[in-house]
Amino acid sequence: MSGALTIACVEPQMASRIWPKIRDMIDKGYAAGDNFMPEDIVEGIRYGKILVWIAVDEENGHIHAAMTTELVPMRCGLVCWMGQCAGDRMHDWSKFHVEIEKYAKDEGCVKIILKGRRAWERVLEGFRIRTVQLEKLL
């Protein structure tokens, strides 16, 4: 039986403990964009430069999704980059951005940016397409 999901930010000191459980999820997010997972991602997570967010089953503790965020200074001000995200039971955690928006506001961010598939546009309320990435296979 599956329970309700809770969205939680993993404390950097705890991230190394759960990394084996979420590594493949994070890598799946990179793979969806045809990218390799950066070798230094674990170090960034360990030192709190990159935060990990998880969707956890309240009944059995199973992690159903994982995502990364990173605060980045830009010309407009501090920006929260929503990074790689993957998992299952998306309909149960698709409103995760509300928690991340609260976090970003508390940290003084002026906006949130994410790069992903077009399907995210339907899921993330209030987000709009700002740029387009074009590709041509050779």
Residue spans of the language-model regions?
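A generic structural signal for short, solvent-exposed coil/turn residues
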Residues: 1, 45-47, 61, 74, ...
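Terminal substrate-recognition subdomain of acyl/acetyltransferases
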Residues: 1-4, 8-15, 115-138
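Short amphipathic alpha-helix that is part of the acyltransferase structural core
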Residues: 1-36
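Short, flexible, glycine/charge-rich loop motifs used to bind or transfer phosphoryl groups or to couple energy/partner
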Residues: 42-43, 70-72, 102
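Acyl-donor binding region in acyl/amide transferases
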Residues: 75-126
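Conserved donor-binding loop and adjoining core beta-sheet/short helix segment
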Residues: 47-90
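Active-site rim helix/loop that mediates acceptor-substrate recognition in acyltransferases
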Residues: 30-52
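N-terminal start-of-chain detector that recognizes signal peptides
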Residues: 23-28, 39-40, 53-58, 84-86, ...
